[in-house]
């Protein structure tokens, strides 16, 4: 049986923290789908198409990673892909409560899909897409926070020179 995991998020933009979780998940599962979900409570900075392209470029050297988007329930997408796992990263205890609520709802919707949590490496425990955008907006260096393709895309959007 092939083990298939879904790593989902808004990825607006993808960070090295996201990439760390994806790479580690790709070592455990046969296939990992990185899925851009449309979060109705967030106003995206990058379009879905831009985010997909940034993720594809950032994960191009991980052969068992596929990139996609979805507008519905994550559990429905997982069923469509015959996935048996949802992969989630935890940065801090504060993430756990929210993730536990989502996991409980996903289990209620489909008990056959398990959620696996991976603790973020300490070097990324503070990192979020929101922080990255804030630093880039004011011309700060994001070189140690995002893949090079994302750094270039942020500089282009904010019209700031590369540092």
Swiss-Prot record:
Q: Name one GO biological process term.
A: coenzyme A biosynthetic process
The UniProt entry, under Pfam families, shows: CTP_transf_like
Where on this chain does substrate bind?
A: 10, 42, 74, 88
InterPro entries xref list:
Cyt_trans-like (IPR004821), PPAT (IPR001980), Rossmann-like_a/b/a_fold (IPR014729)
Tell me the route in metabolism or biology where this protein functions.
Answer: Cofactor biosynthesis; coenzyme A biosynthesis; CoA from (R)-pantothenate: step 4/5
Q: Which Gene3D superfamilies match?
A: HUPs (3.40.50.620)
Domain of life, per lineage: Bacteria
Q: Which residues are recorded as binding ATP?
A: 10-11, 18, 89-91, 99, 124-130
Role this protein plays? Reversibly transfers an adenylyl group from ATP to 4'-phosphopantetheine, yielding dephospho-CoA (dPCoA) and pyrophosphate.
Protein name listed in UniProt: Phosphopantetheine adenylyltransferase
Give the organism the record lists: Bacillus mycoides (strain KBAB4) (Bacillus weihenstephanensis)
